[in-house]
């Protein structure tokens, strides 16, 4: 039996070549280390200029972008990490660092609580500021304090209080001829005689009153009782 040594040599060479290529591909795949980290193909990293960071491994057969920690629908496709994937059980956070999934979820919960607390504090502060502003406006537009107003307007309001509230009228008869309420009450209390009538209404000139005195009793009946302001006018 004749064996062509040339063909055999070529077959051996091809077998050795494909075996070498296969071993190279196997070495390029990441392998999990003893401490949970991944060994990477430093030759490929050196060739591509990409260095994977902690909790990452090199992957030259990348098909899709990675998921982000705080948004699973937001894919990370940054150029500097296109061949470095997070190890199994890790996920990339908003700082582009691979962290454990439970740490990622815990971090997101803390962020949510912080945002909610901040929003509540902002709302409380705005409400407090609004109350202060409303209180300031109310005080600035009120000249009299509530307690003082209650004291001033409790019971009968006299002319002095009215002038204080509504303003004192100019050229008022009150300035020229102030009325003494107590004195008037004393003067007009009971029967009114002719002298009192003359004092109030004035004594008429050339009056028949000098010859024919008035009937005091009749006048007293007319003006007996309390004389109001209209009668005085």
Swiss-Prot record:
UniProt KW keywords: Host-virus interaction, Inhibition of host innate immune response by virus, Signal, Viral immunoevasion
Region Disordered, residue ranges: 201-233
Keyword Nucleotide-binding: no
Signal peptide span: 1-28
Entries under InterPro entries matching the protein: Ser_inhib-like_sf, TIL_dom
Disulfide bonds: none
Gene Ontology biological process terms from the UniProt entry: symbiont-mediated suppression of host innate immune response
The TIL domain, residue ranges: 52-104
Biological role stated in the UniProt entry: Counteracts the host humoral immune response by inhibiting the processing and the amidolytic activity of host PAP3. Thereby, melanization of host hemolymph, normally producing several reactive intermediates toxic for viruses, is deregulated and proper immune response cannot occur.
Assembly description: Interacts with host PAP1 and PAP3.
Family that this chain belongs to: Belongs to the polydnaviridae EGF-like motif protein family.
Descriptive protein name: Protease inhibitor Egf1.0
The species this protein was found in: Microplitis demolitor bracovirus (isolate Webb)
